[in-house]
Amino acid sequence: MTTGNFFREQYPKKFMGIDGKSMAYIEEGIGDPIVFIHGNPTSSYLWRNIIPHVGHLGRVIAPDLIGMGDSDKLDNTGPANYKFEEHCKYLYKLFENLDLSNVHFVIHDWGSALGFYWTQLNPKRVKSITYMEAITGPIESWQDWPEVARNIFRAFRSDAGEELILEKNIFVERILAGDGKLSEEDLEIYLAPYKIPGEDRRPTLTWPREIPIAGEPNYMVAIAESYAEFLSKSDIPKLFINADPGSILVGNQREKVRLWNNQREVTVKGGHFVQEISPDDIGGHLADFIASFK
């Protein structure tokens, strides 16, 4: 396993100004871009043990979403901030400035929604998509959400969410750290952007409120429906890395994506943060998939 210090030495962060804010990202290598997008509440550090498997195959790019990782926080934030549309604005401008084409996406959690939507908007610029524990479309009801997480996610979407996350930091300290697989060093790196109670933690609260579930929020349901319909028919090559037992891409959601066009499927061990459990298996499958385009 790659240590935090070694990873940061081998893949130092770069920074780019986007609308007055600094976006952090990793960029190493040459060739077609291999773009890793994390979700909530992680950062590009999520990919530390997977990136080395494919570094020789292209130009590795791994951003920290706005307000997360080493990217800047937004100013004067509240419940209206860090929504999907706002993340799109910053991330997609970064992509434009990096002049991306022939992209191999590697995406997880909310990073998947951001990558899927960009693919729908820019299909001729995407060469392949690898996804795991992803938001592959609207979730019809709470019965399709993991039972162990149902009550807490409903609480996040209620008035109790501010206390649970902005004050108690539940998403990072309980959900991410909950399986006990992270070292103290790894957990400290993930915790760093959210040390200060209050608005610094806002991204990790807004994200669960954006999940398109049981018809809400309406605009996210529409976006997820749209990209799911596009991806189900698109001939863009896809690699579905199925997590066993998994967490959110299970049951009905998993059966739906198994019908997507031009797709391979492999299975690795892990729950939602599968990169922390099976990075070498993921890295091996990813390397084989990307190498097949050479």
Predicted regions and their residues:
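Active-site helix-initiating loop/hinge in glycosyltransferases
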Residues: 39, 277-278
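Flexible "cap/lid" subdomain of the alpha/beta-hydrolase fold that forms the substrate-access gate
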Residues: 2-14, 18, 22-26, 33, ...
